[in-house]
Design a protein with these regions (language model features):
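Conserved pre-ATP/AMP-binding loop-to-beta segment of ANL
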Residues: 1-9, 16, 39-46
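Conserved AMP-binding A3 loop
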Residues: 5-29
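Conserved AMP-binding/adenylation subdomain of ANL enzymes
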Residues: 28-46, 54-94
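Alpha-helix capping/helix-boundary segments
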Residues: 80, 102-103
Length: 196
């Protein structure tokens, strides 16, 4: 279980993309937690996955999650906002693995007949901005949006298990959060000089 399954490239948000070690246990635990506790993927579902399989969102949250529960998956080499809803209808995809910009592109498309009564009821991913969340959920009638936050090489992550709007959810890790002043580019402190 602790054996190395593969190396996966990080997104590069904290610097140059790098290869991160992925043990087998992390694949199993990650995909199982996402499917069962997160967006409740089952063998009756078909997932739309247009993300690269060399990144953890497309591979772990997408393909491995489907394998974990015996769900089908429609893998698209390249995302196209104009053909998305037609493909969703054609392949009856009930789940969608995303990064936030895909949701923005879909929201900026003119309404089309295929988006009405679309079968997508659940989605999982990262980067869906709060200012777009309600618009996306309401326009496309998505029941469960499971936003996650974590790094490929991290030991844990945040997950929106309770399907609350505009949140990355919770974690089971013992962590502390601090207030950050973006304008001053530093942590906020109280009158005693302690971090808030």
């Amino acid at each position: 279980a602790g054996d190395t399954a593969f190396y996966i490239f990080t997104s590069g948000t904290t610097g140059v993309p790098k290869a991160a070690l992925f043990p087998n246990v992390k694949i199993i635990a990650g995909s199982k937690n996402i499917t069962m506790a997160g967006y409740r993927l089952t063998s009756d579902d078909c997932m739309y996955n247009c993300l690269p399989l060399y990144h953890s969102t497309g591979l772990i949250l997408g393909l491995c999650a489907c394998i974990q529960v015996g769900a089908s998956t429609f893998i698209k080499r390249k995302f196209s906002a104009s053909s998305f809803w037609g493909e969703v209808q054609k392949f009856n995809t009930s789940a969608f693995v995303y990064v936030g910009e895909l949701c923005r592109y879909l929201s900026f498309q003119e309404p089309c007949d295929e988006e009405i009564n679309n079968p997508i009821s659940k989605m999982v991913g990262n980067g869906l901005r709060p200012d777009l969340w309600d618009t996306f959920r309401n326009r496309f009638n998505v029941e469960r949006i499971i936003e996650i936050y974590g790094a490929s090489e991290a030991n844990g992550m945040f997950m929106n298990l309770l399907n609350k709007d505009q949140t990355i959810g919770m974690t089971n890790l013992d962590i502390k959060l601090f207030a950050y002043d973006v304008a001053e580019d530093k942590l906020k402190v109280d009158s005693n000089g302690k971090y808030i």
